[in-house]
Amino acid sequence: MSTESMIRDVELAEEALPRKTAGPQGSRRCWFLSLFSFLLVAGATTLFCLLHFGVIGPQREEFPKDPSLISPLAQAVRSSSRTPSDKPVAHVVANPQAEGQLQWLNRRANALLANGVELTDNQLVVPSEGLYLIYSQVLFKGQGCPSNHVLLTHTISRIAVSYQTKVNLLSAIKSPCQRETPEGAEAKPWYEPIYLGGVFQLEKGDRLSAEINLPDYLDFAESGQVYFGIIAL
């Protein structure tokens, strides 16, 4: 073998050496890329499944453990939702046959007195101390507007056992007529609802009343339009 042939063989071997050594490195790099892609897809699939089935999700609101950080009304509502339905409750409706007055009845459909509440002298008597939701609605109806201004009032009052004085808890005034119906013009009907509601601390034996000033304008055409009630919280 000549010297030139030996030199040519060495050069060919040197050129072939990088290609041979690059082969395993390229294979290893491809293997790592495949593994990374597989783990990425598997992780995304697992996360989707956990979100879909509710295993993980947005953090739920938690009530503070310290009772002093919760408002009294919130504590009462939470306590009410956890206890049996033995709390005082009342829902009375207006008597459509009582002319010229607003008379409450409990012996009617969708009316009730439960767990100690009494209806005496057209007033609801509170059976126990605590927070109560008090509410009432009336619906007035008229035809046309007279010359004198029509003012409709609706008031919920309390007579407490501690001081025996009538005090207004909730009150509202509305005027359905802005101007008098012109002479000869058609007297169009009008409707005016008034709703009152609020939460109050009451004592055992307190009496509550819901009154209006113009009972002749009350609308009894449909049931469920005029009512009065309390719910212990």
From Swiss-Prot:
Glycosylation sites: 80
Membrane topology field: Single-pass type II membrane protein
UniProt GO molecular function: cytokine activity; death receptor agonist activity; identical protein binding; protease binding; transcription cis-regulatory region binding; tumor necrosis factor receptor binding
The protein, known as: Tumor necrosis factor
Organism, scientific name: Macaca mulatta
Record topological domains on the Extracellular side: 57-233
A cellular-component GO term for this protein: membrane raft
Cystines in this chain: 145-177
Post-translational modification comment from the UniProt entry: The soluble form derives from the membrane form by proteolytic processing. The membrane-bound form is further proteolytically processed by SPPL2A or SPPL2B through regulated intramembrane proteolysis producing TNF intracellular domains (ICD1 and ICD2) released in the cytosol and TNF C-domain 1 and C-domain 2 secreted into the extracellular space. The membrane form, but not the soluble form, is phosphorylated on serine residues. Dephosphorylation of the membrane form occurs by binding to soluble TNFRSF1A/TNFR1.
SMART domains in UniProt: TNF (SM00207)
Keywords from the UniProt entry: Cell membrane, Cytokine, Disulfide bond, Glycoprotein, Lipoprotein, Membrane, Myristate, Phosphoprotein, Secreted, Signal-anchor, Transmembrane, Transmembrane helix
Segments on the Cytoplasmic face: 1-35
PROSITE patterns named in the record: THD_1, THD_2
Gene Ontology biological process terms in this record: antiviral innate immune response; cellular response to amino acid stimulus; cellular response to ionizing radiation; cellular response to lipopolysaccharide; cellular response to nicotine; cellular response to type II interferon; chronic inflammatory response to antigenic stimulus; defense response to Gram-positive bacterium
Subunit structure: Homotrimer. Interacts with SPPL2B.
Subcellular location: Cell membrane
Residues recorded with modification Phosphoserine: 2
Annotated lipid attachment (N6-myristoyl lysine): 20
Residues that span the membrane, as ranges: 36-56
InterPro entries: TNF, TNF_alpha, TNF_CS, TNF_dom, Tumour_necrosis_fac-like_dom
Lineage: superkingdom: Eukaryota
Site (Cleavage): 34-35, 39-40, 49-52, 76-77
Keyword ATP-binding carried by entry: no
The THD domain, residue ranges: 88-233
Family note: Belongs to the tumor necrosis factor family.
Pfam family, one: TNF
